[in-house]
Swiss-Prot record:
It holds the Pfam family EFP_N. The gene is efp. One of its GO terms (molecular function) is translation elongation factor activity. Its main location: cytoplasm. Involved in peptide bond synthesis. Stimulates efficient translation and peptide-bond synthesis on native or reconstituted 70S ribosomes in vitro. Probably functions indirectly by altering the affinity of the ribosome for aminoacyl-tRNA, thus increasing their reactivity as acceptors for peptidyl transferase. SUPFAM superfamilies: Nucleic acid-binding proteins, Translation proteins SH3-like domain. It is found in: Cytoplasm. Belongs to the elongation factor P family. It comes from the Bacteria. It comes from Mycoplasma mycoides subsp. mycoides SC (strain CCUG 32753 / NCTC 10114 / PG1). Pathway: Protein biosynthesis; polypeptide chain elongation. The keyword Nucleus does not apply. This is Elongation factor P. The keyword Cytoplasm applies. PANTHER family: ELONGATION FACTOR P, ELONGATION FACTOR P (EF-P) FAMILY PROTEIN.
């Protein structure tokens, strides 16, 4: 595939790595051949890089497979997922799930991404239901609109929640930024 065809969301192979296009820009000056600048994420390491190609240069399209999986548990080193159709279990190193581990609860349905049977990572649901295990006491009289307090969730994630949220409350949290969305 030509680098001119790269668009956000496209995956491609370059220098032995798999990249996901985040942004793409084409620039041409005078008589020179155009340049394509791509901001991409290395799907193996998670590193974000900027790659520059000569217009018309070719790269291989990476066929990424997504499978719906159920999160089972983690043993500290690896997270274990199960394919609900075949009951096949797969493990992913927790080091690849630095942000995602804040939302992984038993039974959560997620999408696992893989390339040629190599597990690259997981895609979380947009919103996840979690339980508050510890919450600061609300200060009496602190009723300014939007007043918030700290709460620790069952996964260890610490977030700001409204004053009415107490220990044991089930809440909905955005997996994109870790912010409180609402009550479950």
């Amino acid at each position: 595939m030509s680098v001119n065809d790269l668009r956000p969301g496209t995956t491609f192979l370059y220098d032995g790595n798999i990249y996901l296009v985040l942004e793409q820009a084409f620039s041409k000056t005078g008589r020179q051949q155009g340049k394509v600048t791509v901001k991409a994420k290395n799907m193996r390491t998670g590193a974000r890089v900027e790659l520059t190609f000569t217009g018309g240069e070719k790269v291989d399209k990476a066929m990424i497979e997504r499978k719906e999986m159920q999160y089972l548990y983690n043993d500290g080193n690896d997270a274990y997922l199960m394919n609900t159709e075949t009951y096949e279990q797969v493990s992913i190193p927790m080091t690849r799930l630095e942000w995602e581990k804040n939302f992984l609860v038993d039974g959560l349905m997620i999408n696992m991404t893989e390339f040629e049977n190599e597990v690259l990572g997981i895609d979380l649901p947009v919103k996840v239901e979690l339980t508050v295990v510890e919450a600061e006491a609300a200060v009496k009289g602190d009723t300014t609109s939007g007043a918030q307090k700290k709460a620790i969730l069952e996964t260890g994630l610490e977030i700001m929640v409204p004053l009415f949220v107490n220990q044991g409350t089930k809440i909905i949290v955005s997996s994109a930024d870790g912010k409180y969305v609402g009550r479950a």
